[in-house]
């Protein structure tokens, strides 16, 4: 459907709340790249790149900052939620506070028409759209206003962490990682948050807000019941039994574990093969970063041209100044 696909590893953004631990960010770059590639990303069809290796993004952010007020950033629901989650309170790093502007640069630099995100990122995309409209109204049509692309499966809009308290996040340590061993996955699934009032098997259970059922909504298919839980035809039947009582959390968690293990097994196998040639992964990232930089440089050139700050390329400006000072 898309002529070009750019996928960014946001190491510079990660530094906004890891400035004192750059080694952590550095080490995670290869982990993220392995995750993307093991899930099937084809570098021949998509451009995988590292944010910090495209300095044009930083320059674009600097220009966009003049189009956004502090008050507008403070009203961004995603920013407010992230600040609360990280307990920054009155010590918010400036880089973190302004990351919606940085994200606007990440999107507009590649003339993106579509941005696939979870629902929690909708305010960020809307802020990008505002920046695009503001820039174009001041300097003329230059930037592309992107559309948001949400998952068809509503359960995938925002997967909660296994603790049930927030979205799944590496920084919060409530994730199931693609690199986890089968035993790691099993332990995490068996420790998942469910309904705290579902104490005995006979107790009626709550499905809404129950992590286990949220993950089943996201990953479970009818054929899984044939293989792992033949007493039920589909997920609706399982939910109804849980809600009326008589179905224990352990049984449901064991089923989810089987579902996730089946989903993750081919990913783990591909990852194991990719790990055998790490220099090749860096080659992919280098080639992708070079391609991304070329694209971003073109957009930056157009932005500076629209703003009339392309001094050395502006023959008319040079001529006018020459005439002014020759009198």
Residue spans for each PLM region:
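Short capping/connector residues at structural and topological boundaries
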Residues: 54, 69, 75-78, 84, ...
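Non-catalytic, well-ordered alpha-helical scaffold segments
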Residues: 58-62, 99-102, 122-125, 209-213, ...
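Conserved nucleotide- and phosphate/pyrophosphate-binding catalytic cores
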Residues: 129-327
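Non-membrane alpha-helical structural segments and their capping/turn regions in soluble enzymes
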Residues: 23-30, 122-125, 282
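N-terminal Rossmann-like or analogous alpha/beta NTP/dinucleotide-binding catalytic cores
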Residues: 1-105, 223, 262-264, 268, ...
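Internal, conserved structured core segments that host functional sites
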Residues: 77-81, 85-135, 139, 160-161
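Active-site-proximal beta-alpha loop/turn segments in soluble metabolic enzymes
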Residues: 15-18, 109-113, 167-168
